[in-house]
Amino acid sequence: MVIPSTFWLGLGYFTYFFSFGIFLPFWAAWLKGEGIEPSMIGILLGVGLVARFIGSLIISPRVKDPSKLIKALRLLSLLALIFAVGFVFGSHWLWLFFVMVGFNLFFSPLVPLSDALAGTWQKQFTFDYGKVRVWGSIAFIISSALTGILMSANGINFSISSLDIGWSMSFDSLNGWIGKEVFGTHHIILAFLIFSITVMLLGMMLKPAVMPVGKEKTTNTNTVSFKELLSEKSVWQFLVCVTLLQAAHAGYYSFGTIYWENAGYSPSTIGYLWSLGVMAEVLVFTFSKQLFRRWSARNLLLLSGICGVIRWGLMGISTELPVLIIIQILHCGTFTVCHLAAMRFIGARKENEIIRLQATYSALAMGGGIAVMSVIAGFMYEHISNGIFWVMALVALPALFLRPKVEAHTH
């Protein structure tokens, strides 16, 4: 079956982030449901993040021929599905360690390779990347909310009172038909994840109307070395700053769901809270040009740091719903504004520095820093519970003073 190329790309983003909207907010809850201790949950999530970093940094750049991008995406989707199914076959920490590494290793390169495909297609025909990419964020919002509902509800009810139409299905009857307690329990997380990745793979198997073409990329001999790049004070200040700001999310990513469950919130409410954070993120990304047209990377990092100290401090103080709503809205400051600052700083560098600096930023801020703090948070959560969010606020605090004082070089 042949479909429009932009539809193929949008479907890929939608199904990937639909899966990620199940995995990121609720995987710690699944591990807890399998009887894993908080300290081991932190280790497993940290190992997964390290594997994501390795997958993005090593696997993605190996696809140098743009015409091979779709084959690579199909293969990685298949491998991710195989490892997702692997979670069914055991809950011993050693087995989970192995499967977490494999799943994240092959799941993580899907977005950078999809972005590379988008860039290739933009050279072949004109389309609005933002309008295609936004379907990923919409999918995350839907799946995180829906997973919470399927975990906590007793069934599905649908009615239109004005037309006297009604329909309902009990989860007890569904579970009885399956022969296992899946719906309304933590088991739905894994089942839903496997289903979503299966749909992603099936979507990848469709044929886009326009296949990607291009010349194989060759190594740029003018690329600056890591040593040369890090010898500049503003660069290492930038990297330390963004790594601290993103690493401060580790407590939230790893234990936010469990913390809110222990505070008495239902999985459906928790799903809505996660969705709210992404909705705020989408709004800021959408209107970033209007909001921050004249902001420097240094000032954006200041705003992100202030939001981080406030957000994580509030999370350690209160679990009242109005406060949690404010906390989740602040996600657009702690994550989105920080990412916008990074893109502004990196985009203003010399051309031969951009690829290496982008890779270093992704490795440290979006991978390594969060991985290390996830492991630390796992050990700390057992002893100080909500105190880990105060620690996260302290992690973000030095970033206020480490912001690069000199603006990045221009092209």
PLM ranges: what are they?
Residues 151, 155, 188-213, 399-407:
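C-terminal membrane-cytosol helix-exit motif in multi-pass small-molecule transporters
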Residues 355-383:
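A late C-terminal transmembrane helix in Major Facilitator Superfamily
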Residues 2-52, 235-273, 339:
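Helix-loop boundary and gating motifs at the non-cytosolic
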Residues 1-3, 177-179, 206-242:
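Juxtamembrane intracellular "pre-TM" segments in multi-pass secondary transporters
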Residues 71-85, 299-314:
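Structural signature of the two symmetry-related core transmembrane helices
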Residues 14, 83-84, 93-113, 243, ...:
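Hydrophobic core of transmembrane alpha-helices in multi-pass small-molecule transporters
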Residues 54-68, 151, 283-296, 381:
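Helix-to-loop junctions at the C-terminal end of transmembrane segments
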Residues 27, 107-123, 336-350:
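Intracellular juxtamembrane helix-capping segments at the cytosolic ends
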